[in-house]
Amino acid sequence: MKGFIILLLSLSCSISMAQENMPLSNSHVIKPNIVYILADDLGIGDVSGLNPEAKVNTPNIDKLIHNGMTFTDAHTTSSVCTPSRYSIMTGEYAWRTKLKGRVLDGYSKALIEEDKDTAPKLLQRNGYETAMIGKWHLGWNWQFKTEETFEMDPKNPYQFKEDISDKVDYSKPFTGGPTDCGFDYFFGLNASLDFPPYVYSENNKLITIPTATMKPDGKDKNFPGGRKKDLVGGQKLKRKGDKAPDFKAEQV
């Protein structure tokens, strides 16, 4: 099987979905590997291959520019994370959901409905193995320690009105996340790097229980909340970057 890996650091693009059951290509044609990289706040002038005076050299991106095609007139469905991610996954505007503004946090319910078709589901139907490494930020459904129900925020129907962080059973798998939306493998964080809980997830479970607390120190502007005991702000991206080549190497 060919591999499709999506590295979600943040969203600045959108896609259109193909018809639900339309094959991507003839079954006899070799399908290419697909690597979809999304970067936050990256302008044309930030890439050295497009701007010789760029502040940072980007040799690997420059190789893609010199050996491929470059599009410089792109548009996104939103200027913030959650709605633009929703559009990439589903091909729809996020305002078609009940989320009419703002973004989700680390404890929000799943934004993508169970029966909603997505780009990775389309690829799975066409013989691809799919993976996502990085920031999800589309919500998922936590399991709780009790059968208690919690009131939702009237301004955001996917977000709880009260702090439910101590109500979550972090040892149980969650639903509605990447592996329920078309990805065979997931490694990363539920929401933005500044939202708790500050722990990594693999597939549909946390890889560790948040036993410490992240506190803003004036430099790392995180919302206070649970974190992995030995996790500090500067480490949050590193391990996700280490995981991506592993999946690609296994699929090629």
Q: What residues fall within each predicted segment?
A:
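Formylglycine-dependent sulfatase
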Residues: 2, 18-252
